[in-house]
Amino acid sequence: MGHMVNAIYQIDEFVNLGANSIETDVSFDDNANPEYTHHGIPCDCGRSCLKWKNYNDFLKGLRSATTPGNSKYQSKLILVVFDLKTGSLYDNQASEAGKKLAKNLLKHYWNNGNNGGRAYIVLSIPDLNHYPLIKGFTDTLKQEGHPELLEKVGYDFSGNDAVGDVAKAYKKAGVSGHVWQSDGITNCLLRGLTRVKEAVANRDSGNGYINKVYYWTVDKRATTRDALDAGVDGVMTNYPDVIADVMSEAAYKNKVRLATYEDSPWVTFKK
């Protein structure tokens, strides 16, 4: 996953470096409208924190990059994680944010269900208390007459909360399936793999809530190897070419590969 892809030109930049997925930050205005693709200061070491685009305009650019037949089409780009910056919202605005997010995606990305972008979408929420965002989102797509698009949508709570607490939040939100579990920290700091291994164990238990596990932000070859050895399904990185190099090493080239559009992001991979 290419990290912090917040300008339209960066979509091509990261995919051309080897990414099959991108992560994009979404900020909200005071009325819970998705406003900009913007991270802000501070952000990862070695990156510009200030790139941004109007959210709806970014969605249109993303749609072009993920619609077969479009001149901007990137066939390798199959998944987009929206890092929802809901920290600016009150808890009671979460549901409204979900409703507005659904309407924006439906209109500007999915083209109202008429040959829109094909990428899978993961809604990544930093606060467990904002679980109503999920129901606001799913209910709105159903009310707008497009429940089939929920097959393209997954969920993540990104706050590094205890795995058991995350499971409870999903239960409240009515989610069973399509769950990606993130774990990580900015590349400026070190973080061990203890919680990653706990999430992988939940994924592989047969009765856990997790379908996929990803780790962020992974920029070094040694960290990439450690994450792959821990059994993650994906890593988020500022340097997709570094990840590609490690995946081509003798220890990994016959064990892991980049996912393609034919691989379901919601089905747990069985070894």
From Swiss-Prot:
NADP is among the record's keywords: no
Summary of the tissues where the protein is detected: Expressed by the venom gland.
Keyword ATP-binding: no
A molecular function (GO) term: metal ion binding
Matches recorded under InterPro entries: PLC-like_Pdiesterase_TIM-brl
Cofactor note: Binds 1 Mg(2+) ion per subunit.
Coiled coil: none
Active site: H3, H39
A GO CC term assigned to this protein in UniProt: extracellular region
Listed EC numbers: 4.6.1.-
Primary localization class, coarse: secreted
Cofactor: Mg(2+)
Pfam families: GDPD_2
Catalytic activity as recorded in UniProt: an N-(acyl)-sphingosylphosphocholine = an N-(acyl)-sphingosyl-1,3-cyclic phosphate + choline; an N-(acyl)-sphingosylphosphoethanolamine = an N-(acyl)-sphingosyl-1,3-cyclic phosphate + ethanolamine; a 1-acyl-sn-glycero-3-phosphocholine = a 1-acyl-sn-glycero-2,3-cyclic phosphate + choline; a 1-acyl-sn-glycero-3-phosphoethanolamine = a 1-acyl-sn-glycero-2,3-cyclic phosphate + ethanolamine
Keywords of this entry: Cytolysis, Dermonecrotic toxin, Disulfide bond, Hemolysis, Lipid degradation, Lipid metabolism, Lyase, Magnesium, Metal-binding, Secreted, Toxin
Protein localization: Secreted
Entry similarity comment: Belongs to the arthropod phospholipase D family. Class II subfamily.
Function: Dermonecrotic toxins cleave the phosphodiester linkage between the phosphate and headgroup of certain phospholipids (sphingolipid and lysolipid substrates), forming an alcohol (often choline) and a cyclic phosphate. This toxin acts on sphingomyelin (SM). It may also act on ceramide phosphoethanolamine (CPE), lysophosphatidylcholine (LPC) and lysophosphatidylethanolamine (LPE), but not on lysophosphatidylserine (LPS), and lysophosphatidylglycerol (LPG). It acts by transphosphatidylation, releasing exclusively cyclic phosphate products as second products.
Protein name: Dermonecrotic toxin LhSicTox-alphaIA2aiv
Organism the protein comes from: Loxosceles hirsuta (Recluse spider)
